[in-house]
């Protein structure tokens, strides 16, 4: 398997090149997680979102693209939890109200165990993308 430094670009046969750099925000959209998530959803066949917290504001930011992704026939699975009591019930209700059963929404709740992942996995025909890090929705 090839190894890349953080400054190298990887061309994986998609419209644009992807950087293996960390996404930190700033004025360059390519370094913003939000931009990458939206871009990745445009041609995905399925997406798995695994985050410890869901906030209504974050769901609202992604809602239109989630709707478009579903309309194209892609599958969306979301796994979240109530670790530290931070997930907002209004975020869960918003997903169910707007996207209904078209989204597989699951809730991890095991007393005494932490649940703190932040992963976005995009599955395409020939490859998958994975974003991991510190951003919740």
Language-model regions, residue ranges each:
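PLD/PLD-like phosphodiesterase catalytic module centered on the HKD motif
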Residues: 1-137
